[in-house]
């Protein structure tokens, strides 16, 4: 699979580039169409908040879909990542307006941790960001990127 960022929604456990932030914007309350800034500190491995910004200003990624994991016992990060990959990749084309495999954007996601799961967090947050990790200056919705 192409490079990806995997984070968790209450305490972010990250693979790839980190997704931590220091604003008062809760990771658990993201909305489709929100644009976010990734932290300057690339060594960060946890997050409970994300810096949100206007999509017309420089930003690192955009929320393009939300999904929910089924209730029950915590399924583990591997199972949640499989679900997130399926959900996010299937929603990518319709939101961005281009095929995921040929897009200049990558799909990344945030998933619940065991701790956030215990607080009823079932959110899977799908993010689009440039493959080269450059900044975006507009929404990726129907952009064809």
Predicted regions and their residues:
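Repetitive helical segments and hydrophobic/amphipathic motifs
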Residues: 11-13
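Bacterial Sec-type N-terminal signal peptides, specifically the leucine/valine-rich hydrophobic h-region
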Residues: 16-19
């Amino acid at each position: 699979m192409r490079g990806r960022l995997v984070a968790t929604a209450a305490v972010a456990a990250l693979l790839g580039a980190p997704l931590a932030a220091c604003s008062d914007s809760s990771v658990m309350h993201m909305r489709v169409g929100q644009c976010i800034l990734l932290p300057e500190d690339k060594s960060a491995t946890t997050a409970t908040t994300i810096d949100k910004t206007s999509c017309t200003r420089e930003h690192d990624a955009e929320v393009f879909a939300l999904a929910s994991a089924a209730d029950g016992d915590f399924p583990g990060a591997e199972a949640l990542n499989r679900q997130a990959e399926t959900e996010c990749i299937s929603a990518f084309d319709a939101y961005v307006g281009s095929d995921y495999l040929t897009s200049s954007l990558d799909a990344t996601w945030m998933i619940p941790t065991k701790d956030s799961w215990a607080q009823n967090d079932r959110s899977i947050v799908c993010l689009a960001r440039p493959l080269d990790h450059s900044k975006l200056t507009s929404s990726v919705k129907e952009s064809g990127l």
